[in-house]
Amino acid sequence: MIEASKLRAGMTFEAEGKLIRVLEASHHKPGKGNTIMRMKLRDVRTGSTFDTTYRPDEKFEQAIIETVPAQYLYKMDDTAYFMNTETYDQYEIPVANVEQELLYILENSDVKIQFYGTEVIGVQVPTTVELTVTETQPSIKGATVTGSGKPATLETGLVVNVPDFIEVGQKLIINTAEGTYVSRA
């Protein structure tokens, strides 16, 4: 059992028969009354997100999530296909369940498949990935890093804010946790 006050982003727990992943968690102390935990959560099975509050002392059953190394093969219609790199088993995951993760991976990328028991519940991408810029505004001569930046579309369709000196065709390092530009590759 884990208390609501100990829940952090990325953790998974069970509540009311649902498997829930914490997207955001914060303590909130209203002017009067006791502290509450405000959370943004995702139902792992349905993919729906919702906001809720819990008392800090409420307890939940922490879900045991196992991961296996896998490779992203391809996407067809509404299904993404992955292969376990140890056993060569293939997994089909609805695109709706991994839509955010697909913005960070290309075909043949290494990932980790997450299991709850025997049920595939998601994909874990590396903390940083290397992607190529496919579309952005032209560079401005003399641009520096201190500027406000400009939007750039990457090869997966992800749009990130980048410094003004970035050009089409350059490879960038992207932080997958925040969806932000880190550096040129």
Swiss-Prot record:
Cystines in this chain: none
Subcellular location per the Swiss-Prot or TrEMBL entry: Cytoplasm
Pfam family, one: EFP_N
GO CC, alphabetical: cytoplasm
InterPro entries, per database record: Elong-fact-P_C, NA-bd_OB-fold, Rib_uL2_dom2, Transl_elong_fac_P/YeiP, Transl_elong_KOW-like, Transl_elong_P/YeiP_cen, Transl_elong_P/YeiP_CS, Transl_elongation_fac_P
Annotated keywords: Cytoplasm, Elongation factor, Protein biosynthesis
SUPFAM superfamilies hit by this protein: Nucleic acid-binding proteins, Translation proteins SH3-like domain
UniProt record, GO biological process: peptide biosynthetic process
Protein family membership: Belongs to the elongation factor P family.
UniProt name for this protein: Elongation factor P
Species: Streptococcus equi subsp. zooepidemicus (strain MGCS10565)
